């Protein structure tokens, strides 16, 4: 089992809300460690590489700042030029589009969070996913770039844009720090309700449709 979790697939507990509303605190997320490559178990030595992360995928990686295992969404890939203007993303000079998010996703959050944030479906090309934003004046956190992403580097952001320690804080993430692609919530417990199971979040794909 330990060998399986090291080299093939793992499940990770999510302790923070940086990926809300896609991933909530208490979710257990399944990570495919064979999505991009095969590594020697318990090491970072790569035996074979067959794919690279693409924009919009949710990945796990070790932070270049403190080596903590994080989960974020890939926004910038090698060769991309990324900018943000008052929380709106621009990819290669093309603005992301923002549409209405399904109300059922918003209602997963408590009323305090619902009233403090605005919610959208952010779309980059054919890729779309939920994001939540807190209306605020422009600052260095919601305005940056343009940044050209160098080879073997990736720009990561949390879906909870104003409450995420992502590439705006830790910098770009090198390819060798990425450990796998997250694709499913295996199960979930509610920390605020005595760890009661959230049955509606069991075996739930992370892909937004």
Where are these regions (language model features)?
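Soluble "head" domains of membrane/secretory-pathway proteins
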Residues: 10-13, 21-209
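A short acidic/basic microdomain associated with nuclease active sites
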Residues: 16
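Hydrophobic membrane-insertion alpha-helices, especially the h-region
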Residues: 1-7
């Amino acid at each position: 089992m330990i060998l399986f979790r090291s080299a093939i697939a793992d499940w990770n507990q999510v302790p923070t809300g940086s990926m809300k509303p896609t991933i909530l605190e208490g979710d257990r997320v399944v990570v495919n460690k064979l999505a991009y490559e095969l590594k020697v178990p318990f090491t970072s030595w790569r035996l074979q590489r067959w794919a690279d992360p693409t924009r919009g995928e949710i990945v796990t990686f070790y932070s270049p700042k403190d080596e903590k295992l994080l989960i974020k969404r890939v926004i910038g890939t090698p060769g991309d030029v990324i900018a943000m203007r008052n929380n709106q993303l621009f990819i290669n000079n093309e603005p992301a589009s923002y549409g209405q998010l399904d109300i059922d996703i918003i209602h997963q959050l408590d009323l305090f969070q619902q009233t403090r944030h605005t919610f959208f479906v952010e779309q980059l090309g054919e890729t779309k996913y939920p994001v939540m934003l807190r209306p605020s004046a422009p600052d260095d956190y919601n305005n940056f770039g343009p940044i050209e992403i160098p080879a073997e580097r990736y720009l990561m952001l949390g879906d909870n844009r104003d409450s995420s320690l992502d590439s705006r804080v830790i910098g770009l993430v090198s390819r060798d720090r990425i450990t796998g692609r997250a694709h499913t919530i295996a199960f979930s417990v509610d920390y605020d309700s005595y760890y009661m199971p959230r049955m509606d979040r069991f075996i739930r794909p992370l892909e937004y449709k």
